[in-house]
């Protein structure tokens, strides 16, 4: 089978950008078993409850659901196991210092294949308060209405 080129997004965490203000993003490799890779290639994963943490100078991804591979045998993986993230030491130290400041967390934003290798985009994020969420929603609606008004004006020939 030929190697895949380019990016193929497997799963995105749409709630993350709604619930958090993402300050920094990083691309990290994932240490996976064979059945996890096969399950991901079928597009089966959920990042909804997922989070990452730094422990002992290593970054870990936890609570990400990758379902068991249907054609797997007794050698299948546990769906919600802890998975190691592959990052440079400087990146891990930078993330760890930010999280230790308080108020910050590490959330997975998307899992994708880049040139045949599974990658996860993680973000260092700060939780949004309820009024921040409402304000962001209001701004989005105002921008959408302004775009509609400009488009209708364009169609009228003004």
Curated annotation (Swiss-Prot):
GO BP term, example: trans-translation
One GO MF term: RNA binding
Any single Pfam family the record assigns to this protein: SmpB
Lineage top rank: taxon: Bacteria
Region (Disordered): 133-158
Keyword annotations from UniProtKB, A to Z: Cytoplasm, RNA-binding
Entry annotated with the keyword Coiled coil: no
Family: Belongs to the SmpB family.
Xref: PANTHER family: SSRA-BINDING PROTEIN, TMRNA-BINDING COMPONENT OF TRANS-TRANSLATION TAGGING COMPLEX
Function: Required for rescue of stalled ribosomes mediated by trans-translation. Binds to transfer-messenger RNA (tmRNA), required for stable association of tmRNA with ribosomes. tmRNA and SmpB together mimic tRNA shape, replacing the anticodon stem-loop with SmpB. tmRNA is encoded by the ssrA gene; the 2 termini fold to resemble tRNA(Ala) and it encodes a 'tag peptide', a short internal open reading frame. During trans-translation Ala-aminoacylated tmRNA acts like a tRNA, entering the A-site of stalled ribosomes, displacing the stalled mRNA.
Name of this chain's protein: SsrA-binding protein
Organism encoding this protein: Leifsonia xyli subsp. xyli (strain CTCB07)
Gene name as annotated: smpB
